[in-house]
């Protein structure tokens, strides 16, 4: 089947609505919407929930941008895209809770198509979701990965292990030699066996995010925390910032294509701290995190 960008866009708009509604229902606060236009073509709608009952900041962004030429970040490793017009659309979200016992979560699903007259379109899907805990709970990690495995299962036995490994490899801070979190799923350049199959998988990932995350929020939201836990959360959020600004391809693509900076950087935590050469106390729950986020098979 020929790629149908319109159908993808309609799904993404519904997905943004659905995720925002479910996060609001858990939190009690509402999202504020900010619609924007891109001068070079396209636009989007950014939604942010701030200082809610549970979430310090949750950002759920839809964007649909298009242009006559590809940015350098895309053509560097895809020379066949040179000279093509393009459309890129997606939903991207990051949730930063108040409570340090609730992990930060990130999800993204996207579609890209590049065309030129007289040639077949070049298209693919990408996306995934990943979890960044501050305090490790095995049952949360197992639930997160089991949900990921179950949504992958109808698409083949090899899908979950392949995209889990890709996620572990991608969300890695090379300059720190450590994982960002416990991973989940990451896929990109998905265009086989056909459009319908790939679109179905992208929808499964997008719809699976709240099933993976919200039970963890419910399980941890009543846990009591204090200044110690908060300081550790802010310190670890620094790793999140480092990854997004140094390593994340999506951030680079957005900035190079003249995307909306406020929306691109919506993933940043509202508060964060760095402390020179800080080390957690031996044997403490904070010290246990470095072992907890090591790559492993959770299920």
Swiss-Prot record:
Substrate binds at residues 92, 108-110, 258-260. It catalyses: coproporphyrinogen III + O2 + 2 H(+) = protoporphyrinogen IX + 2 CO2 + 2 H2O. Keywords: Cytoplasm, Heme biosynthesis, Metal-binding, Oxidoreductase, Porphyrin biosynthesis. Pathway: Porphyrin-containing compound metabolism; protoporphyrin-IX biosynthesis; protoporphyrinogen-IX from coproporphyrinogen-III (O2 route): step 1/1. Residues 240-275 are annotated as: Important for dimerization. GO terms for molecular function: coproporphyrinogen oxidase activity; metal ion binding; protein homodimerization activity. Its cofactor is a divalent metal cation. Homodimer. Belongs to the aerobic coproporphyrinogen-III oxidase family. PANTHER family: COPROPORPHYRINOGEN III OXIDASE, MITOCHONDRIAL, OXYGEN-DEPENDENT COPROPORPHYRINOGEN-III OXIDASE, MITOCHONDRIAL. Involved in the heme biosynthesis. Catalyzes the aerobic oxidative decarboxylation of propionate groups of rings A and B of coproporphyrinogen-III to yield the vinyl groups in protoporphyrinogen-IX. This is Oxygen-dependent coproporphyrinogen-III oxidase. The lineage of its organism: Bacteria, Pseudomonadati, Pseudomonadota, Gammaproteobacteria, Enterobacterales. The gene is hemF.
């Amino acid at each position: 089947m020929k790629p149908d960008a319109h159908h993808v866009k309609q799904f993404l708009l519904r997905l943004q609505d659905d995720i925002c509604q479910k996060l609001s229902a858990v939190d009690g606060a509402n999202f504020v919407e900010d619609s924007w236009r891109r001068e070079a073509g396209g636009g989007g709608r950014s939604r942010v929930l701030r200082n809610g009952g549970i979430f310090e900041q949750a950002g759920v962004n839809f964007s649909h941008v298009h242009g006559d030429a590809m940015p350098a970040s895309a053509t560097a490793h895809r020379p066949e895209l040179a000279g093509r017009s393009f459309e890129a659309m997606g939903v991207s979200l990051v949730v930063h809770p108040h409570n340090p016992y609730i992990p930060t979560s990130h999800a993204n699903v996207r579609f890209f198509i590049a065309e030129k007259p007289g040639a077949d379109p070049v298209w693919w899907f990408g996306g995934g979701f990943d979890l960044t805990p501050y305090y490790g709970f095995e049952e949360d990690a197992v639930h997160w990965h089991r949900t990921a495995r179950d949504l992958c299962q109808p698409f083949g036995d090899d899908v979950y292990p392949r995209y889990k490994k890709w996620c572990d490899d991608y969300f890695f801070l090379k300059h720190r030699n450590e994982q960002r979190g416990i991973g989940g799923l990451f896929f990109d350049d998905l265009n086989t066996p056909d459009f319908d199959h790939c679109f179905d998988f992208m929808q499964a990932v997008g719809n699976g995010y709240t099933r993976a995350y919200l039970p963890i929020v419910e399980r941890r939201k009543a846990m009591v925390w204090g200044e110690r836990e908060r300081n550790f959360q802010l310190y670890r959020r620094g790793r999140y910032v480092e990854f997004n600004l140094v390593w994340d391809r999506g951030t680079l693509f957005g900035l190079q294509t003249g995307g909306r900076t406020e929306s691109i950087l919506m993933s940043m935590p509202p508060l964060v701290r760095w402390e020179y050469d800080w080390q957690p106390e031996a044997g403490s729950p904070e010290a246990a995190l470095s072992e907890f986020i090591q790559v492993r098979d959770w299920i």
